Structures are given as structure tokens and as C-alpha cells.
């Protein structure tokens, strides 16, 4: 009788341990930023970047001040990062970064300049407060994604 009970206890413990092991979430990869899409490999050799807004460039008089500030913030971040040379004409660019800043959410998208504006974005992130002056987490995520793409 005692042997029957102890074998049931052992079986129950093994089943419980197996269930817990299978149900446990996988730990995140050490090098992958969470929720950051991978940067397109076709653009890792790009050198020139143009920054604009979905509603027009920074010199458009109808552009919202938030979008104008987002353009300047991204331009400053690109210059500090130093991976790309900033250009002020879309025809000179390899990559076009498009921004939109709204109270509810900011957007940063990467386009191949050779198909822009007809083509779809190749990389995009959105987030509340993602393109604020002085701190641009969306640009930081772009840098991380680019660095991971070039490290391969």
C-alpha cells in the first residue's frame, strides 16, 4: 500500500514539473531588442538619408509644428549617430525616414528612396512620445535594429 502511494506521489510531482516547464515563457534573446522589427538587409549599405513628414517636408508652411520638431529631432539623432549622411533633397538619398508626431502616437518609418513615395515602408515603429525633442526612443530602436542587421 505504501509503495503504491509513493509511486503516485512521484508520478504527480513529475507531471507537475513537466507541466510547469512547458508552460514557462521563453526568456528573451540576449541581443534582440524587444518588439523591434528587424532592419531590411537591402538597406544596410545605404549612406545618405532624407528625413521628412507624411504631411510634407520641414519647410512646408502647412506642416504641424509637432511634425516639424520630429523632423529636426530625427535629423539631429542621425547626425549624432553618424552612420548616415543627412541630405536635404529626396533625390540624393538612399533611405527616406518619414515621421509623424501626434499626441496619441509617434511614427518613424524607413523607405527605400529609390521607390519612394510609391513603395511601402520597409521598417516602421510607433509609440507614444517616441520622437520627442532630446529623446527619441524610436530612433534608438532604429539604431539597434540597424546594428543587429549589420552584425550578421
Regions found by a protein language model. Give the residues of each.
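Compositionally biased, low-complexity segments enriched in small residues
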Residues: 1, 14-15, 27
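Bacterial N-terminal signal peptides
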Residues: 10-21
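Amphipathic beta-strand/beta-sheet edge segments enriched in Tyr/Trp
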Residues: 95-152
Amino acid at each position: 500500500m505504501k509503495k503504491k502511494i509513493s509511486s503516485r506521489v512521484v508520478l504527480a510531482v513529475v507531471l507537475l514539473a513537466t507541466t510547469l516547464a512547458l508552460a514557462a515563457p521563453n526568456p528573451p534573446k540576449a541581443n534582440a531588442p524587444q518588439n523591434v522589427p528587424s532592419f531590411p538587409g537591402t538597406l544596410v549599405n545605404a549612406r545618405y538619408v532624407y528625413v521628412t513628414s507624411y504631411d510634407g517636408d520641414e519647410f512646408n508652411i502647412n506642416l504641424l509644428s509637432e511634425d516639424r520638431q520630429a523632423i529636426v529631432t530625427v535629423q539631429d539623432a542621425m547626425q549624432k549617430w553618424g552612420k548616415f549622411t543627412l541630405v536635404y533633397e529626396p533625390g540624393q538619398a538612399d533611405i527616406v525616414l518619414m515621421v509623424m508626431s501626434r499626441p496619441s502616437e509617434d511614427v518613424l518609418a524607413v523607405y527605400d528612396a529609390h521607390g519612394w513615395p510609391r513603395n511601402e515602408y520597409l521598417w516602421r515603429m510607433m509609440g507614444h512620445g517616441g520622437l520627442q525633442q532630446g529623446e527619441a526612443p524610436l530612433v534608438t530602436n532604429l539604431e539597434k535594429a540597424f546594428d543587429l542587421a549589420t552584425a550578421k
